[in-house]
């Protein structure tokens, strides 16, 4: 007897997106705002969230996403706005809004392995992040610098080239590279006071 697994090619994005969207739509926006420390405009029914230096308005309960300028208005499409188009970015922010919570940083940075459950998923992280970063930019430090500066990252004195980027409000990531090394790169994440 054959088992129908109902597997679809896009199930790794569509199914989680639909799940977390339903959770988001049934959540209390005021509770989300308080827990995640993200502003919520009850009149407009919109959150304001920052991702990689770009501010976005996110409607509730629809989850329509628009990047906004410094004056708070929807700005023209001039840059890269992953939260508007990329399913993985949409899922990440949905998960943060439905399950996450803001916590002040301890001021220390952790490697991925030091984060709770980091050791369990380290091989996947190593392949998807560390090796790609090192292989893609280990011999192209100028290109790495240009990209990091474009997204608003600040140079730090680590490795041959290092940058610190505020990924989300209060969550900083450090990306560190060594010239010509296609195997060694480091990514450090700021440690919250609670996990």
Roles of regions detected by a PLM:
Residues 33-64, 154-179:
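Amphipathic, interaction-prone secondary-structure segments
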Residues 79, 83, 134, 161, ...:
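Short, charged/polar micro-motifs that form catalytic or ligand-binding hotspots
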Residues 2-45, 98-151:
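Short Lys/Arg-enriched alpha/beta "domain-start" segment
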């Amino acid at each position: 007897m054959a088992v129908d697994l109902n597997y679809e090619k896009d199930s790794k994005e569509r199914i989680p997106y639909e799940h977390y969207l339903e959770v988001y739509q049934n959540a209390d926006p005021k509770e989300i705002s308080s827990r995640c420390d993200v502003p919520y405009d009850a009149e407009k029914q919109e959150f304001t969230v920052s991702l990689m230096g770009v501010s976005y308005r996110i409607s509730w309960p629809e989850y329509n996403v628009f990047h906004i300028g410094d004056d708070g208005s929807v700005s023209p499409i001039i840059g890269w706005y992953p939260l508007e188009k990329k399913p993985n970015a949409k899922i990440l922010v949905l998960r943060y809004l439905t399950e996450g919570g803001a916590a002040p940083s301890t001021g220390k940075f952790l490697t991925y392995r030091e984060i709770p459950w980091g050791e369990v998923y380290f091989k996947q992280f190593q392949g998807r992040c560390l090796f790609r970063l090192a292989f893609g930019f280990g011999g192209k430090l100028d290109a790495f610098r240009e990209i990091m500066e474009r997204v608003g990252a600040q140079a730090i004195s680590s490795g041959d080239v290092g940058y610190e980027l505020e990924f989300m409000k209060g969550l900083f990531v450090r990306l560190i590279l060594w010239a010509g090394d296609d195997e060694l790169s480091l990514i450090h994440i700021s440690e919250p006071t609670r996990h």
